[in-house]
């Protein structure tokens, strides 16, 4: 019987997921979306129509939004729900980064992630200073990245929240619980046998 990760709800036996689309390849998932966007642009005779998806974000939040700006917009109330973080720019000296980490109360292990990115690309666990130096050396010279306290729990929840302009309350339209599979070996059996 599958066992849920600590802090996550129990895994249902034989219950199909409500949606499996999140795990499709990006090109397959987004192709119909882009076709629909193009059709709407033609129908409404506006190439800028997609930018209205979220008018408070650059490009409507479709691409290129900076995580650091989104984090900062949460204010003092919302930021308490986030793991502590700092923004690192390419011009920051290692001593300045170390000082910023100390000022923010951060210590290894950390998570490094691009300030602009999606779907986990460029996200690395950083366990020590050497790994941070390596991450920085392999990161594009012109891009900022975020160092954030590592949340050491199994599983992850993805929440899709929608609030229409002018409304005080929004709605959660999608909730995805992700469990990361793992296998404990016995020293002799193959992976296939263990599964």
What do the PLM-derived regions correspond to, one by one?
Residues 1-80, 87-96:
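ATP-binding N-terminal substructure of ATP-dependent carboxylate-amine bond-forming enzymes
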Residues 55-56, 66-195:
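Active-site nucleotide/adenylate-binding loops and adjacent lid/helix of ATP-dependent enzymes
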């Amino acid at each position: 019987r599958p066992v849920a990760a600590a802090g996550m709800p129990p895994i249902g036996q034989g219950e199909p997921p409500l949606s499996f689309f999140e795990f499709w390849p990006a090109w397959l998932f987004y192709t119909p979306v882009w076709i629909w966007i193009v059709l709407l642009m033609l129908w409404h005779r506006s190439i800028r129509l997609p930018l209205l998806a979220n008018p408070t974000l650059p490009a409507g939040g479709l691409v290129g939004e900076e995580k650091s700006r989104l984090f900062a917009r949460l204010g003092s109330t919302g930021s308490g729900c986030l793991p502590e973080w700092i923004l690192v720019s390419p011009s920051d000296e290692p001593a300045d980064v170390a000082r910023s980490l100390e000022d923010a109360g951060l210590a290894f292990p950390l998570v490094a992630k691009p300030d602009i990115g999606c779907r986990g690309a460029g996200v690395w666990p950083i366990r020590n200073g050497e790994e941070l130096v390596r991450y920085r050396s392999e990161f594009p010279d012109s891009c900022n990245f975020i160092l954030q306290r590592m949340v050491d729990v199994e599983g992850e929840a993805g929440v899709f929240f929608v609030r229409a302009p002018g409304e005080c309350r929004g709605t959660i339209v999608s909730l995805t619980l992700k469990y990361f599979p793992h296998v404990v070996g016995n020293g002799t059996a193959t992976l296939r046998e263990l599964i």
